[in-house]
């Protein structure tokens, strides 16, 4: 079926906020075109990671090729490139959109436009895609398609005269959607004669065939056995297998401009086949790569340590395997006196961090200790040089630096207007600066704030959801760095600094954070044979302290009557012993203590 002319190929993706029915719609399209038989059909067919099904989110990109006979009697090939809808995976979305000519904008008829939808629509508009609005879930009792159409026109500025009303669950509107894709999405440019340029929009590691690269052929043609070159890394390989996804892989002899398929070429690591990179032929190279390739930059860092130090090698292997599939994951070895050997890992955002952590625990049976997430600070030293600090324990002392700058994000929240007050208050407590506020149709509002990323990564999202009873949605983008009065807060247990508990906080908040941290640790660290002081300090100045009293045996149990000096002697002896113990004893800090610090509300 590879002999379809370029004019009858349509490449499209589906843009939607989480839970607006994107995966279900994809399932219906696969069914309606007969790509998947009823026997193979299962809900959310393209979400093939166990974790994706469970959380109901799409993490990794999937692609599927469908054959469709349109009403004009012609056979078309429709390539659906599924996109993740979550804020952390924006780069994945952007490069999958770059592989398309059109997009279905799916909006829930009862919920309306959400913040994440907006962010992805702007990405689609940047890539000049034809956008087809689809109002989904019209079968719900609370559906208000007219209101939602008005909202899309008002908020995004799209013409919705051709919007399609649908219900993916009930199968309503599916034929109209397929026709709209054929009629309204432009075909790819016919550049089969040009030198090969293929855009990598995803890759995953197969233990038998090496890395399988998902590509959209932009120009030229590629055949099995061709020698190819990756333009960003300069590496060369020979193609062992070419194919298309229906959504199960099916080998073909060649792929030409406009088509979407996969390439296997015995590639050892996803590192070598970076997403967004351009593939070209060795003997006929393209003059320049496709635009838009960016190195994925980690924004949130944390330490991962095996709770049992014997598992260090397994953790390393597991991270390397995940890295094969996840180019945005970054890690380097780290040693912590409190936690032993582990890794410092960088992630795109909080959800990405949780997903990686859960996959490590689930798929590789590891038991992990995770330190508090931190962001990357820019520190200007006395000599004028700037360093990037992703770990609070590496922050230079105050006398060696002139300023600390923290990353600032622009947060856009869409919410019902009755919650505006409480959300504005939340943003103020998180050191936010108010930027903009717009009233939308039907009592909804958008709020725009600039907030320090450090405040967003802890528990901002949870608090936002609880303050708005789950009705708010948010999206954030980096806007740059800004200097502020930041200090490093150290936690000392029994006089020793526990580096994994150090955090960088704003000076105004240091006292409150320190006080609540030591109070929390006091509850969680078990009592020892000697008393254990827990202190929060900025530099050498202690700002909060709690003491865990010692466990004591009743040494007076065997003295019935007798002289008080006898009792005193025994008590003194016990006290001496405790003192000696304290000098040499070490304090066990349980994992719960680290996790509690992580979850601590910055009230």
UniProtKB/Swiss-Prot annotation:
HAMAP family reported in the protein's UniProt record: GUFP, LepA
Compartment(s): Cell inner membrane
What's this chain's function? Answer: Required for accurate and efficient protein synthesis under certain stress conditions. May act as a fidelity factor of the translation reaction, by catalyzing a one-codon backward translocation of tRNAs on improperly translocated ribosomes. Back-translocation proceeds from a post-translocation (POST) complex to a pre-translocation (PRE) complex, thus giving elongation factor G a second chance to translocate the tRNAs correctly. Binds to ribosomes in a GTP-dependent manner.
Q: Which organism is it from?
A: Synechococcus sp. (strain JA-3-3Ab) (Cyanobacteria bacterium Yellowstone A-Prime)
Q: How does it sit in the membrane?
A: Peripheral membrane protein
Q: Which reaction does it catalyse?
A: GTP + H2O = GDP + phosphate + H(+)
* Binding residues annotated for GTP, in chain numbering: 19-24, 136-139
Query: Per the database record, which ranges form the tr-type G domain?
Result: 7-189
Q: What are its E.C. numbers? A: 3.6.5.n1
Which SUPFAM superfamilies does UniProt cross-reference here?
A: EF-G C-terminal domain-like, P-loop containing nucleoside triphosphate hydrolases
Give GO terms: molecular function aspect only: GTP binding; GTPase activity; ribosome binding
Name the cystine pairs. none
Protein name listed in UniProt: Elongation factor 4
Gene label? lepA
Answer whether the UniProt record assigns the keyword NADP to this protein: no
An example Gene Ontology biological process: positive regulation of translation
Q: By its UniProt entry, which InterPro entries does this protein fall under?
A: EF-4, EFG_III/V, EFG_V-like, EFTu-like_2, G_TR_CS, GUFP, LepA_C_sf, LepA_CTD
Q: Which UniProt keywords apply?
A: Cell inner membrane, Cell membrane, GTP-binding, Hydrolase, Membrane, Nucleotide-binding, Protein biosynthesis
Q: Where primarily located?
A: membrane
Cross-referenced Pfam families, in alphabetical order? EFG_C (PF00679), GTP_EFTU (PF00009), GTP_EFTU_D2 (PF03144), LepA_C (PF06421)
Matches recorded under NCBIfam families: lepA, small_GTP
Instruction: Please name the PANTHER family in this protein's record.
Output: TRANSLATION FACTOR GUF1 HOMOLOG, CHLOROPLASTIC, TRANSLATION FACTOR GUF1-RELATED
